Amino acid sequence: MNAKDAVGLRIQVLCAKHEITVNELARKCGVAPSTIYSMMNEKSKNPGVVSIQKICDGLDISVRDFFNDSLFENLDPVIK
């Protein structure tokens, strides 16, 4: 799995865990729902750290907690 896909899946998992929709998350983060949706699908090729931090702030978790998941353990190499 590549990092972009892992970020998108992690957002889905965290929304389910916190029992909120993407629209609710966007409201809490102060970003447009389209920003989050683009991070979750093919439109965003490189989710930015600032956007991820806003999502973490909206979920009241740290960036460390966001990435502290097995999804990020065996990512595909970017440089081959």
Regions found by a protein language model. Name each.
Residues C15, A26, C56:
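The alpha-helix within a helix-turn-helix
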Residues V13, S38, F67-K80:
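Short, charged recognition helix plus adjacent turn
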Residues C15, M40, S51:
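DNA major-groove recognition helix of helix-turn-helix
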Residues E19-S38:
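Short alpha-helical DNA-recognition segment
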Residues M1-I20:
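A short, Lys/Arg-rich alpha-helix, primarily the initiator
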Residues Q12, N23, Q53:
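Residues within the helices of the helix-turn-helix
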Residues K43-K54:
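Short, basic-rich loop-to-helix N-cap that marks the start of a DNA-contacting helix
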